[in-house]
Amino acid sequence: MKLLWQVTVHHHTWNAILLPFVYLTAQVWILCAAIAAAASAGPQNCPSVCSCSNQFSKVVCTRRGLSEVPQGIPSNTRYLNLMENNIQMIQADTFRHLHHLEVLQLGRNSIRQIEVGAFNGLASLNTLELFDNWLTVIPSGAFEYLSKLRELWLRNNPIESIPSYAFNRVPSLMRLDLGELKKLEYISEGAFEGLFNLKYLNLGMCNIKDMPNLTPLVGLEELEMSGNHFPEIRPGSFHGLSSLKKLWVMNSQVSLIERNAFDGLASLVELNLAHNNLSSLPHDLFTPLRYLVELHLHHNPWNCDCDILWLAWWLREYIPTNSTCCGRCHAPMHMRGRYLVEVDQASFQCSAPFIMDAPRDLNISEGRMAELKCRTPPMSSVKWLLPNGTVLSHASRHPRISVLNDGTLNFSHVLLSDTGVYTCMVTNVAGNSNASAYLNVSTAELNTSNYSFFTTVTVETTEISPEDTTRKYKPVPTTSTGYQPAYTTSTTVLIQTTRVPKQVAVPATDTTDKMQTSLDEVMKTTKIIIGCFVAVTLLAAAMLIVFYKLRKRHQQRSTVTAARTVEIIQVDEDIPAATSAAATAAPSGVSGEGAVVLPTIHDHINYNTYKPAHGAHWTENSLGNSLHPTVTTISEPYIIQTHTKDKVQETQI
């Protein structure tokens, strides 16, 4: 213990001696470093083309005709103004030594290019002004390491597009001015990704026709969209801008604002829709804007009819002190010039809204998506009453149930607890209309198909009990399986008890038999149709073949008939006695009873149809007929011997 105490005392003694020495050494080194830095920096001088003030912390070089950034700018400069010169390019490391610079003004020059690394070293830069130059692209690479940049001005540059992640290197931005980009043609969906600290955005006079995606700007408070071309403002245009307080959409040719278009702007305080083409607004359009106190609707051609009455009432209640803010009636003629707040219901005869497409009862299985439609006039408002008494509108926030823009009630997935009656409530200035539908959610067990059928399953069981001879029916409801969008039913199981000795039979009737029977009937009908078709086809083919053969035979007969001449001569049975001698001398040599000798053939004018042609010579045959020299013989006629009572015919060919 004594040794330990001596070591401890010795250690404290050395600490007491060394600590003052270390402290004095550090002070000397700091003093030497300061002297060396002052010596290396030399005297602070202001560039000859600039004017300096506040001990060189403010340097102004405007309107000096500079074509580049001047050299020799003091290193302790906090404010540097180079506006209205002819600077065309900013090279890398131009401002590297200006570590304390907070404001850099380069507007109204001719800058066309900014190199990557042009703003290196500006760790303290707060504001960068590049408006009124000739930039065609956003110099995203030059914004690297500007960790404290709060304001960026790029207005009035011929920038053609804003790509994705154009400003993700400067997440500290709070004000971004992109106004008057008259050459702008495209804004990417992810153009403003990473700007979660942005408070002010100017996109006015950029020739924008569709609202860009502003969802990443969760902290945006002021939005300038005036001077563009928006024919209509749709729901979701300002999605995600729950912190927005001021919205300007002036002189943008807006002619239609759909209902629920401003539902997401819960923090909006000021809204300016002046100098547009609005003639009416949907019922209760401003109801979700609970903090709205300043509204500008003047210089619009308002049509003062039943659809404008709700706006007149709303203005009188929420903005009673400023009747000139919201314009005058443009139509009808007897209302022209009257302030909107002066319009009352006595001037019109209005009717309650009608529901064009009412919701229908729906049976659906658990876990599926569902919709209950309720299509209504565009200038009315739609709300839904749930079975538990909750009222939902488009602006409501529910984890699974939402009201779509067209009034449809949408379920991302249904639960058994969603079963009940849902009522669609449509309202306008004259009244309201309601339509209800029943949603039945069943369990998703045995869900093997998208649709279920109307089925009744009967289960018959038996008990062996002599005393129980009566049948008992006990209906047991079970849930329907499957999913059917509009028409389905629950399955009913009937348990039937009968007395059958020592037998257990469980017959079940399912829709499979019915489906099989229907399928057999369809197949039978199909076979009959096919058989009829085949029979008709074969009959037509047979008729075609017969017709072809008859036609061919007819053609052959016509050819043969045209090539021959048939001459029939009738010979009487009784021959005169005077001719018997001649018959004996006939060259045929036919004799005996029943022989007939043909008479001598002489030339007859009626039978001889051959005429001698010019220069032709004729000969005579054995019959004495004149023939052409080429014909020297002629077949002798046939002698046909028949019964005495028959007639003899001679055929000469």
Swiss-Prot record:
N-glycosylated. Residues 39-527 are extracellular. Residues 39-75 form the LRRNT domain. Its main location: membrane. Keywords: Cell membrane, Disulfide bond, Glycoprotein, Immunoglobulin domain, Leucine-rich repeat, Membrane, Postsynaptic cell membrane, Repeat, Signal, Synapse, Transmembrane, Transmembrane helix. InterPro entries: Cys-rich_flank_reg_C, Ig-like_dom, Ig-like_dom_sf, Ig-like_fold, Ig_I-set, Ig_sub, Ig_sub2, Leu-rich_rpt. Residues 549-653 are cytoplasmic. GO terms for cellular component: dendritic spine; excitatory synapse; glutamatergic synapse; plasma membrane; postsynaptic density membrane; Schaffer collateral - CA1 synapse. Specifically expressed in brain. Residues 353-442 form the Ig-like domain. Glycans are attached at residues 277, 322, 363, 388, 410, 434, 440, 447, 450. The keyword Cytoplasm does not apply. Residues 1-38 form the signal peptide. Pfam families: I-set, LRR_8. The last 4 C-terminal residues bind to the first 2 PDZ domains of DLG4. PANTHER family: ANTIGEN BSP, PUTATIVE-RELATED (PTHR24369), LEUCINE-RICH REPEAT-CONTAINING PROTEIN 4 (PTHR24369:SF9). Synaptic adhesion protein. Regulates the formation of exitatory synapses through the recruitment of pre-and-postsynaptic proteins. Organize the lamina/pathway-specific differentiation of dendrites. Plays an important role for auditory synaptic responses. Involved in the suppression of glioma. This is Leucine-rich repeat-containing protein 4. The gene is LRRC4.
